UniProtKB/Swiss-Prot annotation:
It comes from Phyllomedusa tomopterna (Tiger-striped leaf frog). Its main location: secreted. GO terms for cellular component: extracellular region. It is found in: Secreted. This is Phylloseptin-8.
Amino acid sequence: FLSLIPHAINAVSALAKHF
């Protein structure tokens, strides 16, 4: 589960950068 957290943060970061 802890391995999934950085992936989610990276997705949110990429989404924020896209917008």
